[in-house]
């Protein structure tokens, strides 16, 4: 545990009966950063959040906040706040009373509460909403009230449990921008849970991908996407086409087509058989090329800002996303050209 590790889970296991849902997990979050737990349903991400909050107790292992062992501490003694998916607002209270409820429970004076509630509502762009009620504001505004209620307490750690799931696409975008802006401005150490990759990438300093109670990879979003460390990660983090290939120094061969991959060393593989992952945006079609680059177009769907294409290359499907101006939907055959930035290598599995 380094001096800058603010939230730490050490060898944490959680079992419900014989079912192990968190398996000897080690996790550390630096002070003032936002880390997202991302994974499919049932991977254990929400259980980790509940363990950090004190809503569940680990079967074994320890949890530290700011150097203090809080494994056996109640949620009230952890200096943590949670922003829930359901907002969890009191409909019979005004917005001001909802935001100030935690302060009231802490015995903060009425005058100080009013001041801090005003400041919190200004932070989430709801200045002057103190006297309104829950049924008088929109879903997006309700989520901002829930965020203000957490921020007003100035917690050591802020937890987000899929907070944007109930919002439509446009509101999700604006709310994730607001959450990220406030987290960076206030420097609150934060743990965020979602199953939405776009959301995770937008709000996080680092993303932790979980599967079956284990951490598969922890890295900034760009590294996760461009350098996944397993076939599971490659398939989970966006679309890709996976081919059997070979590596010889910086030369990669797929379907008989050999090309140079200048960044091959970063994948840590030895020469020989490998898996070659190709992101759909890394592929372009040309009218000329080697015989090994030739492919046939199976389908093409216009998606507005790009064409979504499935090509047959060497008897295997190749997924391609290309600019509308750079693709002719009448095309039947073409030659595959690869951009290095969207190619990654994996050990054979």
From Swiss-Prot:
GO terms for molecular function: ABC-type ferric iron transporter activity; ATP binding; ATP hydrolysis activity. Residues 7-237 form the ABC transporter domain. It is an enzyme of class 7 (translocase). Pfam families: ABC_tran, TOBE_2. It is found in: Cell inner membrane. ATP binds at residues 39-46. It comes from the Bacteria. The keyword Membrane applies. Its EC number is 7.2.2.7. Transmembrane segments: none annotated. It catalyses: Fe(3+)(out) + ATP + H2O = Fe(3+)(in) + ADP + phosphate + H(+). Its main location: membrane. Part of the ABC transporter complex FbpABC involved in Fe(3+) ions import. Responsible for energy coupling to the transport system. Belongs to the ABC transporter superfamily. Fe(3+) ion importer (TC 3.A.1.10) family. This is Fe(3+) ions import ATP-binding protein FbpC. It comes from Pasteurella multocida (strain Pm70). The gene is fbpC.
């Amino acid at each position: 545990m380094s001096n800058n590790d603010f939230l730490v889970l050490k060898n944490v296991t959680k079992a419900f009966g014989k079912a192990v849902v968190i398996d000897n997990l080690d996790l550390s979050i630096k002070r003032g950063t936002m880390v997202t737990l991302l994974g499919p349903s049932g991977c254990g991400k929400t259980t980790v959040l509940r363990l950090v909050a004190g809503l569940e107790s680990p079967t074994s292992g320890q949890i530290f906040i700011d150097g203090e062992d809080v494994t056996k501490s109640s949620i009230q003694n952890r200096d943590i706040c949670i922003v829930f998916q359901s907002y969890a607002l009191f409909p019979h209270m005004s917005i001001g009373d909802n935001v100030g409820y935690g302060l009231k429970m802490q015995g903060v004076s009425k005058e100080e509460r009013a001041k801090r509630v005003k400041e919190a509502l200004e932070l989430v762009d709801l200045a002057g909403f103190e006297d309104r009620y829950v049924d008088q504001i929109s879903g997006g505004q309700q989520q901002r009230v829930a965020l203000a209620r957490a921020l007003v307490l100035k917690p050591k750690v802020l937890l987000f449990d899929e907070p944007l799931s109930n919002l439509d696409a446009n509101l999700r975008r604006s709310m994730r921008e607001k959450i990220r802006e406030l987290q960076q401005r206030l420097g609150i150490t934060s743990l965020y849970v979602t199953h939405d990759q776009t959301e995770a990438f937008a709000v996080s300093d680092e993303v932790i991908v979980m599967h079956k109670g284990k951490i598969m990879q922890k890295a900034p979003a760009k590294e996760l996407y461009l350098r996944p460390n397993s076939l599971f990660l490659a398939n989970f983090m966006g679309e890709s086409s996976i081919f059997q290939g070979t590596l010889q120094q910086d030369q990669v061969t797929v379907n008989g087509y050999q090309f140079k991959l200048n960044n091959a060393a970063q994948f840590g593989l030895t020469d020989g058989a490998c898996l070659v992952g190709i992101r759909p945006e890394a592929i372009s079609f040309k009218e000329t090329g080697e015989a090994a680059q030739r492919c046939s177009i199976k389908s093409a769907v216009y998606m507005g800002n790009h064409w979504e294409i499935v090509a047959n290359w060497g008897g295997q499907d190749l997924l391609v996303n290309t600019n509308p101006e750079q693709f002719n939907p009448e095309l039947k055959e073409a030659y595959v050209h690869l951009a290095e930035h969207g190619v990654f290598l994996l050990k054979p599995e």
